[in-house]
């Protein structure tokens, strides 16, 4: 992995959606670079598999079973974590449906997971990062090419990823005023 050239020893990296896909790959790469990975996933079995793979690269992991869409659970779990140096805000999914057939349930789920949960995670982590002035952190909000261009059958996904782009830009402007990296 390319991150092996980056030294993240003694750093703590929180990854949402860590059990599968990009979140899993990021978690392993961060562990290879020396970070202690704080892996959030709804599925304990995915966290257990990730733990085995991180141990294979001699990495460290803190497993947190958590549904990022449940604000109170998320807040409670994050309160137990003392230091976060890196946030990889990755949890998300897509439910492809033609525009005229999009179900409210699907739309609400995608907005709750892809956008609202990302906002909530970022806000809670930034509060923690700002308290720790000696250890400025980095925030990576995972988006998609579909946060820049539209695609047929992906309208709600497009909407949430455009929202992530706006959130990230807004956070960058606001946090820069605090002389804090976004």
Segments the model singles out, each with a brief description of its role:
Residues 98-99, 103-111:
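Substrate-binding pocket helix/loop in short-chain dehydrogenase/reductase
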Residues 102, 150-158, 170:
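Active-site loop-to-helix junction immediately N-terminal to the catalytic Tyr of the SDR YXXXK motif
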Residues 122, 160, 168:
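Active-site helix of classical SDR
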Residues 127, 173-177:
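Alpha-helical segment proximal to the catalytic Tyr-Lys
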Residues 144:
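Residue(s) in the substrate-gating loop at a strand-loop-helix junction
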């Amino acid at each position: 992995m390319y991150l092996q050239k980056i030294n993240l020893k003694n750093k703590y990296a929180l990854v949402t959606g860590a059990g599968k896909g990009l979140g899993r790959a990021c978690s392993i790469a961060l562990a290879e670079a020396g970070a202690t990975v704080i892996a959030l996933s709804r599925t304990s079995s995915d966290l257990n598999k990730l733990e085995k793979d991180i141990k294979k690269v001699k990495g460290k992991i803190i497993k947190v079973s958590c549904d990022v869409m449940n604000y109170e659970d998320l807040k409670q779990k994050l309160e137990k974590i003392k230091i976060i140096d890196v946030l990889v805000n990755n949890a998300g999914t897509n439910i492809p449906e033609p525009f005229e057939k999009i179900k409210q349930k699907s739309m609400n789920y995608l907005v709750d997971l892809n956008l609202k949960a990302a906002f909530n995670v970022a806000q809670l982590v930034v509060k923690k990062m700002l308290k720790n002035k000696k250890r400025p952190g980095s925030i990576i909000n995972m988006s998609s090419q579909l946060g820049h261009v539209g695609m047929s059958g992906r309208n709600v996904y497009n909407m949430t990823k455009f929202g992530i782009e706006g959130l990230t830009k807004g956070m960058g402007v606001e946090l820069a005023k605090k002389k804090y990296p976004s």
